[in-house]
Amino acid sequence: MVRSASSMSRLKYSFILVVTITFLFQLVGCKNDNNALPFLGNREIVNGDTIQHTVPDYLLTDQDSQQVRITSYGNKVFLADFFFISCPSICPKVQKQMLRLYDRYKDDSRVMLFSHTIDQRHDSVTVLHRYAHNLGVDTGKWKFFTAEKDSIFALADDYFVSVVDDPSAPKGFDHSGKIILLDKNRHVRGFCEGTDPESVTAFFSTVDKLLATEYK
């Protein structure tokens, strides 16, 4: 069931709290590990092994009608956001920053970009294809995904991104403009505010640090 704004508001702050606390505790723990990036989210101890929060391998449909999973792309680092094409507020700002990330890493085969629409009613595969074409980007590098609404909302939760059905919000959605960094094991390793160019500039070094540690 798709969540309403009232039910999601509590989840929104819960996720922010989880990410913040996890980030602070693990950041302290990483000081003796060459300042490695933290793992965000809850972790479990199973048979003595630490199991970090992992984004599930959802089945998605891209702008070319291909059904894929994250694991379809092999050992990549992923930069992901959630948007919808008719969004009149934060999405155009986030798009500009995603384009900056695309330009910076377009020749780096280790990095891919994922944009997930939260408006399944209007953002069909055909619309996503046209949107990608108008951006002029390589869709082998930057994928535009759709899926069943419940799946996309659940995926956003796993990325720690707030997505809410809200009739009072522009076009009926209230959502976060965060850009999320995922390592090749689908662990959330960092994020930036996609509406803030300075946050994205600082994020470059975060991505570079992950690449340096993931591909030693």
Model-derived regions: residue spans:
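C-terminal motif of bacterial Sec signal peptides marking the signal peptidase cleavage site
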Residues: 25-29
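Structural microenvironment flanking redox-active thiols in thiol-disulfide oxidoreductases
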Residues: 95-155
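Short loop/turn microsegments at loop-to-beta-strand junctions
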Residues: 55-56, 78, 176-178
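Thiol-/selenol-based redox modules, centered on thioredoxin-like
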Residues: 167-216
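Bacterial N-terminal signal peptides that target proteins for export
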Residues: 2-17
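Bacterial signal peptide processing site
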Residues: 30-34
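Short active-site neighborhood of thiol/selenol oxidoreductases, capturing the structured segment around
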Residues: 68-98, 114
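N-terminal "domain-start" segment that seeds a small globular fold
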Residues: 35-71, 96
